[in-house]
């Protein structure tokens, strides 16, 4: 039996050793195929997805190897799965062959619907996972909430530093090139499926983890992949986890040096933890426009606030105005969204592009 603790990850890669057997399955979830929601749902049933990125030779293997032999993995009641989120890395075939003979869960999506979502991918300007901080003296609400950018530009490439304020239909033309590297992030599957042809493969349509179907799908998967059945009372399984609201929240409103208030989503692909000793003050605000919104602050901050009635009223008015602006911005961004019909219309007007893209799909479907 191999003692992985005595072998450096870099040497294990050179020796072609399979990864340590401390994971239940492999999840092959390409981008814009519901991967963020799937990852969050799995976490809710006690499965943590071990993701690894990087193009360089062996980088993903080494990262996963080191985690699997760490105390964070060994001394943990959670279960783990390896997540493959793209196929853009050196010696990808070797990486796949060094995975254990485990079940493989593959998430699928209608390719035109996936292309639509690819075009619509949003971040907030200061970074997807950054918590935006707002000073209560800043009353330019339209500017505060105008933070969304569309990160797939007309060349089809991902640019986290973009200033692009609208989704680009022209990126379809770039993505119709069969050699475009972004196809390895959202289309290319066949090579991976070929590697795992001797494994047990479970295919899931993304629409099976939307709304009421989510619970049934997770219950079915729990019996196949050996994880806990979902809690039927957990509302997260019925929520839309990725939306403009997800991009713009959470944020922190700084009232003064003693009071900070958090505005967040109750359910999100982002893992928002309500800080210990915080209290939910959502019901204090009349402009709450979505059941997913939650407003909270540390109890001592709230005690300090209610002891100053003038300041308390100022905060109520400020956050209500902020919420009105937030709702307005969300509607603006929703109206920018490219629809499936827009994608099909683009193909109708650009026949050569449509043919090239169809050739790519024919190769993969």
Description of each model-found segment:
Residues 25-28, 40-41, 178-224, 322-338, ...:
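Extended amphipathic secondary-structure runs
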Residues 1-235, 243-275, 279-281:
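PAPS-dependent sulfotransferase catalytic domain
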Residues 1-18, 224-365:
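PAPS-dependent sulfotransferases, especially Golgi type II membrane carbohydrate sulfotransferases
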């Amino acid at each position: 039996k191999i003692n992985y603790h005595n072998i450096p990850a870099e040497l294990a890669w050179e020796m072609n050793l399979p990864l340590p057997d401390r994971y239940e399955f492999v999840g092959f979830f390409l981008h814009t195929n519901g991967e963020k929601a799937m990852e969050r749902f799995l976490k809710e049933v006690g499965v943590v997805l071990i993701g690894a990125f990087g193009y360089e030779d062996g980088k993903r293997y080494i990262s996963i190897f080191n985690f699997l032999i760490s105390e964070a993995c060994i001394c943990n009641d959670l279960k783990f799965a390896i997540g493959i989120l793209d196929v853009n890395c050196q010696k990808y075939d070797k990486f796949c062959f060094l995975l254990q003979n485990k079940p493989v869960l593959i998430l699928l999506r209608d390719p035109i619907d996936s292309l639509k979502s690819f075009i619509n991918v949003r971040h907030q300007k200061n970074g997807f996972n950054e918590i935006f901080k707002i000073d209560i003296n800043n009353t330019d609400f339209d500017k505060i909430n105008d933070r969304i950018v569309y990160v797939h530009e007309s060349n089809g490439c991902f640019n986290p530093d973009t200033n692009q304020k609208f989704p680009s239909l022209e990126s379809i033309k770039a993505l119709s090139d069969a050699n475009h590297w972004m196809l390895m992030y959202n289309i290319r599957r066949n090579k991976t499926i070929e590697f795992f042809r001797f494994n047990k493969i479970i295919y899931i349509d993304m629409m099976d983890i939307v709304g009421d179907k989510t619970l049934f799908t997770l219950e079915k998967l729990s019996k196949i992949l050996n994880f806990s059945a979902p809690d039927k009372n957990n509302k997260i399984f019925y929520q839309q986890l990725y939306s403009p609201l997800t991009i713009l929240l959470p944020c922190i409103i700084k009232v003064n040096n003693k009071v900070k208030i958090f505005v967040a989503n109750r359910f999100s692909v982002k893992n928002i933890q309500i800080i210990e000793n915080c209290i939910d003050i959502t019901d204090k605000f009349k402009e709450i426009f979505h059941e997913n919104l939650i407003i909270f602050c540390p109890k001592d901050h709230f005690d300090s606030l209610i002891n100053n009635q003038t300041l308390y009223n100022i905060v109520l008015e400020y956050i209500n105005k902020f919420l009105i602006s937030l709702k307005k911005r969300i509607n603006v961004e929703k109206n920018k969204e490219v629809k499936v019909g827009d994608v099909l219309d683009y193909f109708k007007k650009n026949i050569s592009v449509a043919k090239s893209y169809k050739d790519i799909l024919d190769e993969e479907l």
